[in-house]
């Protein structure tokens, strides 16, 4: 079941990953993530990379 939240983009084009999403998505401070934009679906995806 998808988890959805609405977030606001800051003036520096930053967004905060909402708590509901973080609970389902094992990301922590310092992790590297890859942001992917799918032009066909107009969807942004986040992929966790190996920690440095």
UniProtKB/Swiss-Prot annotation:
Residue span(s) of domain SpoVT-AbrB: 4-51
Transmembrane ranges, per UniProt, are none
A GO molecular function assigned to this protein is: DNA binding
- Pfam families assigned: MazE_antitoxin (PF04014)
User: Does the entry feature the keyword DNA-binding, yes or no?
Assistant: yes
Keyword DNA-binding among record annotations: yes
Q: Which Gene3D superfamilies match?
A: 2.10.260.10
Keywords in UniProt for this one? DNA-binding
What is the designated name of this protein? Answer: Repressor-like protein SSo7c3
């Amino acid at each position: 079941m998808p988890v959805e939240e609405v977030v606001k983009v800051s003036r520096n084009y930053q967004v905060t990953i909402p708590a509901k999403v973080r609970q389902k998505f094992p990301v922590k401070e310092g992790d590297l993530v890859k942001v992917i934009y799918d032009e066909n679906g107009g969807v942004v995806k986040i992929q966790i990379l190996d920690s440095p």
